[in-house]
Amino acid sequence: MKSVITTTISAADAAGRYPSTSDLQSVQGNIQRAAARLEAAEKLGSNHEAVVKEAGDACFSKYGYLKNPGEAGENQEKINKCYRDIDHYMRLINYTLVVGGTGPLDEWGIAGAREVYRTLNLPSAAYIAAFVFTRDRLCIPRDMSAQAGVEFCTALDYLINSLS
C-alpha cells in the first residue's frame, strides 16, 4: 500500500539517493498528523453503522427514482447492496486513515469502480452524494477534533473526486 513514507522511500530509491531534507519534512508532517488520522479512524469505526445508514438514506432521498422498477434500488436486496457498498468504501476510508495514504482506496476501491458501475448500470453520482453528505454532515467538535475532521474530510474528498 502507498503511504507518504513508502512513496518517499520508493522515490529516493528509484533515484538512487537518500531521502532529501524536504522528503524527510514531508514524512515528519505525516507522522505528526497520525494521531488525528487515528482519532478519525476510531470515531468512524465506532460509529460506522450510523454513518453508513445516514449516507445511504441521504443517497436514496436525493435520488428517489433509484427505487423505481429497473433501477439500482428496485427491491430490498438491491437497496441492501447499495448500503453494503457504502459500508465497503467507509471501511476503505478507515484503512486510508490508519495507513496515512490512499493505497487502500486506490487498490481496493477506485481501480475500475467507474467501469463496474457503468457496466452494472449503477449511478456513481448516488454514491458520490452519500459521501458528500457524510463529509458535509461532520460536526466539529461533536464528532471529532478539528484536525481529525480535516483528515477525515481529506480522505472523503479523495474518494469523491476519484469517483467523479
Swiss-Prot record:
A biological process term (GO) from this entry: photosynthesis
Major localization class: plastid
Membrane topology qualifier: Peripheral membrane protein
Binding-site list for (2R,3E)-phycoerythrobilin 1: C82
Keyword terms of this UniProt record: Antenna complex, Bile pigment, Chloroplast, Chromophore, Electron transport, Membrane, Photosynthesis, Phycobilisome, Plastid, Thylakoid, Transport
Binding sites annotated in the UniProt record for (2R,3E)-phycoerythrobilin 2: C139
One Pfam family cited in the UniProt record for this chain: Phycobilisome
Record PTM: Contains two covalently linked bilin chromophores.
Localisation per UniProt entry: Plastid, Chloroplast thylakoid membrane
CDD domains xref list: PE_alpha
A Gene Ontology term for the protein's cellular component: chloroplast thylakoid membrane
Role according to the record: Light-harvesting photosynthetic bile pigment-protein from the phycobiliprotein complex.
Similarity comment: Belongs to the phycobiliprotein family.
Subunit organization: Heterodimer of an alpha and a beta chain.
Name of the protein this chain belongs to: R-phycoerythrin alpha chain
Gene label: cpeA
